[in-house]
Amino acid sequence: MWWVFEHQRLEKQLAKAPMELQKRYEKWKDIVEISGPAGLLLVRGFRDEALREEWKGYRSSRLNQQYRVIYQIKGDRLHVYVVEVTPHDYRRES
């Protein structure tokens, strides 16, 4: 069993997102909690991938054509830290 931790601003981001996207995120979260990030690779629609450059060390999964969930696997512990759900804009906020 994996633990999913969410950044404090995630609740606000999801509240602004369409209901369909919120449901898709909950499905994503269920898969991660049960199977871990490896389970995401079995679902082609998520197109889970490692990020590069300033997001090196993070991963991204598609929730729909526009929105992505950006997350990080914390060490060898069974923890996934969700940073944000974004409309495909990977610029880091300070």
Model-derived segments and their meaning:
Residues 1-33:
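Arg/Lys-rich, positively charged N-terminal/basic patches that mediate binding to nucleic acids
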Residues 11-16, 20-22, 52, 61-94:
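Enriched for short, Lys/Arg-rich terminal
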Residues 4, 49, 80:
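A broad, low-specificity signal marking well-ordered, structured residues that form hydrophobic/aromatic
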Residues 3-4, 44, 83:
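Residues that recognize and position ribonucleotide moieties
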Residues 34-62:
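A short, surface-exposed loop/turn module that caps and links secondary-structure elements
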